[in-house]
Amino acid sequence: MGNQLDRITHLNYSELPTGDPSGIEKDELRVGVAYFFSDDEEDLDERGQPDKFGVKAPPGCTPCPESPSRHHHHLLHQLVLNETQFSAFRGQECIFSKVSGGPQGADLSVYAVTALPALCEPGDLLELLWLQPAPEPPAPAPHWAVYVGGGQIIHLHQGEIRQDSLYEAGAANVGRVVNSWYRYRPLVAELVVQNACGHLGLKSEEICWTNSESFAAWCRFGKREFKAGGEVPAGTQPPQQQYYLKVHLGENKVHTARFHSLEDLIREKRRIDASGRLRVLQELADLVDDKE
């Protein structure tokens, strides 16, 4: 694939990064959550998967050599987790899906962190996870990052946007590529990396993202909705502009929560993720052997 573009993506204004170039916005929303229940799952709308692009590292980033081909991923050891599955909608439009099964189902397999560079290209979104035995306290919420090549990631960690080695970031032991979970049209990979690098070094008081997922997703999709205070004041939106998080409970049972902003939906989704335990359906010894 190299650095040759497979296609040229024409972006409209709604897909470009907005707001202050420093990423600083002062507005902040505080809204309540309304819950209701449904027995039927809605079908997810069909969206094409984004093409990949070769990129060059922008100024300020550590040089990013090309990652090994991802075509050999079938040779890598996969783990399957028993974890909470979600989908999210704005009105009737599906904007996020972490649901397995079906032709549009997400691949929820995870890999040892040491195997991820073979699956990644610069501009990819990664979700990093900590696996713990069931008796242990719940693990932290999944951590999101932008892969910039050469085994390096840029992420929001402990109140700072920083560049770290993928192998050392937060001591996570497994991860996966999650480019397709959000259904927005992505920016070209070079711009994704540029967005991430352009905010390196920002501290808590300068950051307008409330968690690692919102920052990484903003880098890839450039939508101001991922920023704190990036949407209209609560209570002024019609139902078709409100957000709905569906927690899939199995046996066609769905728990649905309504939100006035994407920021609050992501916060609740991550709270549920952090309160659950990731239980490996295969022996943890397999993971240890794979890392060795």
From Swiss-Prot:
Phenotypic consequence of residue 67 to A: No effect on phosphorylation
Tissue occurrence: Only detected in testis. Highly expressed in colon cancer cells.
Protein family per UniProt: Belongs to the LRATD family.
Protein species of origin: Homo sapiens (Human)
GO biological process: cell morphogenesis; cell motility
Gene3D superfamilies: endopeptidase domain like (from Nostoc punctiforme)
Intracellular or extracellular location(s): Cytoplasm
Gene transcribed to yield this protein: LRATD1
Main localisation: cytoplasm
Keywords attached to this entry: Cytoplasm, Phosphoprotein
Modified positions (Phosphoserine) in chain numbering: 38
InterPro entries, per the entry: LRAT_dom (IPR007053), LRATD1_LRATD2 (IPR043299)
The organism's taxonomic lineage, starting at the top: Eukaryota, Metazoa, Chordata, Craniata, Vertebrata
Function: May play a role in cell morphology and motility.
Domain of life assignment: Eukaryota
Xref: PROSITE patterns: LRAT
Pfam families referenced in this protein's UniProt entry, alphabetically: LRAT
Recorded GO CC terms: cytoplasm
Key word Kinase present: no
LRAT domain: residues covered: 133-228
Protein name, as recorded: Protein LRATD1
